[in-house]
Amino acid sequence: MVEMTETSNEKLITKIAVSIMALFLLVSWLPAFGMPLGDSHEGRVLGQFALHMKNFWSMGAADSSFGASWEPFSDIPYTHHPPVLTFLHVLVSAIIGEGLKQIKLISYVAGVLTIPALFSMGRNLGVSSKAVTISILMLIATPWWWVYGRLGLGLLPNVLMIGTIWAATTNPTKRKIVFASLATFFAVAASWHGVFLMPFLWFQTWRRRKFDQLTLSLIGASILGGLVILFWVSQGGGLSELGEHIGERVERDWTWSQFAQRQWDFAQTLLPLWYMILALPAVLVGLIDSRTRFLTTSLISMVIVFALVPSNGAWVHDYWNFPILLTLFPGFAVMSEWVIGFIKEKIKLTSPKKIDSITLGGFLLLASALILTLQLSDLHDEYFKETSDAGELIASIELSSGQKTAWHLPQVPWPTWVSNKWDVPTLSLLNAGDLGTVPSDDIVLFRIDRIPDWLDEKIEFAIEERKGKYATVTAHVMKQHVTGAKK
């Protein structure tokens, strides 16, 4: 463990490094900021919140279930998740209006703000600022973070809760207690992860302080957050509908060996090789070090429970286990601290300026190497540019007044962004029988590179509108290309 006392130059260097990382995210994310919502996780999630925002203002607070309505995509208010993100979208739209950039603003800003929040959290854990900075670099240098760090509020609510509670536990001033209570309310009312994690954090605080103003304030904040969730669910889809949704998440039609293989495939896609090699040591170090042991244990429990209980979510969504990045963060910070301490002992430079220069130069060299391995251009094209083609295609087509449903094949899943753009419900055509019910002049959206078995691949030559991998044809044309259909 390195000494926690740091010179003013060292503090300045770490602040510069953290600012550079936040700026890197801002600049590298900007190209996707103005792209239309399309066939991606971002398109599906933010398309949903675009509907929440639109319905709140068009239907009113009560009729829209306080923003939970996402008609016409679904008639049942969406209250499966705590309400803070929905409320934030409504608030932003009240200030700066509705639109594509307003929809994306919260997610992108939250992603950038997570960087200084992680730095503050790491320092409150008692880890040196240089080590925390390197751990942040390792986190943002993963495709998992670069792609999904801008989706919703991400890690931000829980990072704020952890950091402020640890700060208040060490030195419980009135101001820190207020910040910890507000952050706890925010995290609980923002995500189920926050609901799960809060009792662990409270227990650790109670062990140190027993019942005092801080522990009682945290109880009050979490209860208030829980009441907000209860109201949100009750006035929206209802507890029974939430139960049905949970039931869908725990159902499975796969084996656990298939599940493990699928998670491994996701990890290989979203995590670089160097990160996976260091992941196990990071877990062990996080558990060994007394400063990070309890937090690492709590976060491991959270990741395991959310992966294995609502396991169908982890089966379907590659981003489901995203919080694992936060779980490994403390361990990577401690490992970095050990390495920095070892290097300091070996180089034995007497000049602080030389040490500062080597530190900054080493950080920039490491950052450059890790960022180069990200292959940002390829990630941007695969996860944003190519999928936004679907949004551009939909935007270029004016739906006829006679078409009341946006038809699509299953290979374009959960297209909330289509409902948002065309203002009609969507329906997936699972087979030729479903296609047979579609009015002949209605258009159908599909992916050219993912033609289902019941369609002839020659349909590619009958396409009427196309953008990238996405295309539309009228139903009567698609019916002519059903496998075995008479021409």
Feature annotation, model-predicted:
Residues L30-G34, L46-I76, V84:
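Extracytosolic helix-loop segments that constitute the early lumenal/periplasmic catalytic or substrate-binding loops
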Residues W144-L156:
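Short acidic/glycine- and proline-prone juxtamembrane loop motifs at membrane-interface regions
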Residues V18, K130, V178, L182, ...:
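Signature aromatic-anchored transmembrane alpha helix within multi-pass, membrane-resident enzymes
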Residues L113-P116, W202-W206, L271-T296:
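Hydrophobic, aromatic-rich transmembrane alpha-helices
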Residues L214-S257, Y275-P281:
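Membrane-lumen/periplasm interface segments of specific transmembrane helices
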Residues S135-I136, W166-A167, K176-W192, M198-L201:
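Membrane-interface alpha helices of multi-pass inner-membrane proteins
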Residues Q102-G126, G163:
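Transmembrane-helix motifs of polytopic, lipid-linked glycan transferases
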Residues H380-F384, S396-G433, D442-I448:
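Short periplasmic/luminal acceptor-recognition loop of GT-C membrane glycosyltransferases, typified by
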